[in-house]
């Protein structure tokens, strides 16, 4: 009976330990992975789909303008001196509209709509948006550079057009309220009868219809972000839903129905990466993340830097920069020719935004050192100006993100235009923006409850089952071999020592299995 009971204990214990191993290390991870595949795909009525369609909280949107403190000297060829003004803080609410699912190829199409709300109390000290900013006249310089590059024979006519439209300006700078250049709009006076300004305004209306607001009396209003505010974007984006393969979720496959761009060379025209609002799960440190930026007409590939923590959740920290187009083979195709690549850290956006602009990291971080020599007042700092993203790797959830970019323009020297003939010819900063995400306690708690608490519970259970099973199995074995173990133990402790009378010394004697006979007494 004892034999059967001992074997039973050992078998039960081994079974419990085996179940703990199978459940904790094999079954549960497989179940979790399967469940995540379902939850992270853009299926209808899932929580992820709802959040993807309309993010239920505001993102940070900060704008920093550069105020030029020596415009008169710059007009004569001196290096600009700038002072950063900001941040101007806006809440950014993102949603997707006109959404359509396409079952046959597992894709979904949408247009995006962003809405901005100014929050002066979260902006820089004392900033109201009514501050006067002195900066290069973006619209005027864009006109001049575009004509200079594309139609140099019309430069004389352009000079007359600038004088007519901008009322005989004395320099290339504008003095505007911050909120005017950002959202409300700067007036462009096209109410002219002279041939040159009238012809220029006709061309402006035709080419700039998507970036200008046409007012009564032949006036135009130009702003950097005004037409993006609470306006449905004209571009139709097509992305993968990830139902058939969750690793494809959010991958951009077309813009306006086109499977690739037609403005760059080779693979630079490809849409690589997600739309930036969702990422695939099961990320490893070796994975090279990719997201496509429609505003910059290119993909970004952040790389893993270190492991860190966000509100108690372990995350992978990624960083990125603008790149070196001349020396990076992956980026060469953004240049018309290798000889025409912009300086390190700058990207020519002319083909993308239809305006002579350059993108860089704020304060020319990671750019050619000459850029900092040409402009005084910049102080690049990786923590303040770099692109940073923290991902929870299992679910692919961005926990914290700082997406930063600076927009720049060349102060091009043009001999045939009076106010441009002595400009220094430097690429100079206009403004930089930061789009920020930081999951609040509510959503972090949701992630913990849905993912990490179950994992911890299972982790405790699996180790408990394994430990209990091993102890039970060991106890069963000991119980089964108890008699043999006791016999071996007792035998190991018994000893018989021979007594030699010559020694004159009594030795300890232990005799097992013999009776003691009393000594005889001789009478």
Swiss-Prot record:
List the keywords (alphabetical): Cell membrane, Disulfide bond, Glycoprotein, Membrane, Olfaction, Receptor, Sensory transduction, Transmembrane, Transmembrane helix
Q: Which organism is it from?
A: Manduca sexta (Tobacco hawkmoth)
Where does the chain cross the membrane? 11-31, 459-479
- So which stretches are on the Cytoplasmic side? 1-10, 480-523
- Record function comment: Plays an olfactory role that is not restricted to pheromone sensitivity.
This protein is called Sensory neuron membrane protein 1
Places the protein is found: Cell membrane
Pfam families tied to this protein: CD36
Q: Which residues are glycosylated?
A: 67, 229, 440
Summarize tissue expression: Localizes to both male and female antennae but not the leg, wing, gut, head, or thoracic ganglia. Detected throughout the sensory epithelium, associating with both sex-pheromone sensilla and plant-volatile sensilla. Differentially expressed both among different sensilla and different neurons within a given sensillum. Expression coincides with that of several other olfactory-specific proteins that are involved in odor detection.
């Amino acid at each position: 009976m004892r034999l059967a009971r001992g074997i039973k204990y050992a078998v039960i214990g081994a079974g419990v330990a085996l179940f703990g191993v199978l459940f904790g290390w094999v079954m549960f991870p497989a179940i979790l992975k399967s469940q995540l595949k379902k939850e992270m795909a853009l299926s209808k009525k899932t929580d992820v789909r709802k959040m993807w369609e309309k993010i239920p909280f505001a993102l940070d949107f900060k704008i920093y303008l550069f105020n030029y403190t020596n415009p008169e000297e710059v007009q004569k060829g001196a290096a600009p001196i700038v002072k950063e003004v900001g941040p101007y803080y806006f809440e950014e609410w993102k949603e997707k509209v006109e959404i359509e699912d396409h079952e046959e190829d597992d894709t979904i199409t949408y247009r995006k709509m962003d809405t901005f709300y100014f929050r002066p109390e979260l902006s820089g000290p004392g900033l109201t948006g009514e501050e006067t900013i002195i900066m290069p006249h973006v619209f005027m310089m864009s006109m001049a550079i575009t004509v200079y590059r594309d139609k140099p024979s019309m430069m004389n006519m352009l000079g007359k057009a600038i004088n007519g439209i901008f009322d005989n300006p004395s320099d290339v700078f504008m003095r505007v309220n911050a909120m005017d250049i950002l959202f409300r709009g700067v007036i462009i006076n096209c109410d002219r009868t002279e041939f040159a300004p009238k012809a220029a305004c006709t061309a402006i209306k035709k080419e700039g219809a998507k970036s200008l607001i046409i007012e009564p009396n032949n006036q135009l209003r130009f702003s950097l972000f005004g037409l993006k505010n609470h306006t449905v974007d004209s571009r139709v984006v097509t992305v993968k839903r990830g139902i058939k393969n969750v690793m494809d979720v959010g991958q951009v496959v077309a813009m306006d129905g086109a499977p690739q761009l037609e403005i760059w060379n080779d693979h630079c025209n490809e849409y690589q990466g997600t739309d930036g609002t969702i990422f695939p799960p099961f990320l490893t440190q070796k994975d090279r993340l990719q997201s496509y930026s429609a505003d910059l007409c290119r993909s970004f590939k952040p790389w893993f830097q270190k492991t860190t923590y966000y509100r108690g959740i372990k995350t992978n920290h990624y960083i990125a920069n603008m790149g070196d187009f001349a020396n990076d083979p992956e980026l060469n195709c953004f240049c018309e020719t290798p000889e025409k690549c912009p300086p390190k850290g700058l990207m020519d956006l002319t083909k993308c935004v239809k305006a002579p602009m350059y993108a860089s990291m704020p304060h020319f971080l990671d750019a050619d050192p000459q850029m900092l020599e040409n402009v005084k007042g910049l102080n690049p700092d990786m923590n303040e100006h770099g692109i940073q993203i923290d991902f929870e790797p299992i679910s692919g959830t961005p926990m914290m993100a700082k997406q930063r970019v600076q927009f720049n323009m060349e102060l091009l020297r043009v001999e045939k235009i009076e106010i441009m003939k002595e400009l220094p010819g430097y690429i100079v900063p206009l403004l930089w923006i930061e789009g920020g995400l930081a999951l609040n306690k509510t959503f972090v708690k949701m992630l913990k409850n849905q993912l990490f608490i179950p994992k911890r519970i299972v982790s405790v259970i699996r180790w408990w089952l394994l430990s209990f099973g091993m102890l039970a199995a060991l106890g069963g074995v000991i119980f089964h071999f108890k008699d043999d173990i006791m016999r071996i133990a007792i035998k190991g402790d018994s000893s018989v020592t021979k007594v030699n009378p010559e020694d004159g010394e009594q030795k300890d004697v232990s005799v097992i299995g013999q009776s003691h006979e009393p000594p005889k007494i001789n009478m």
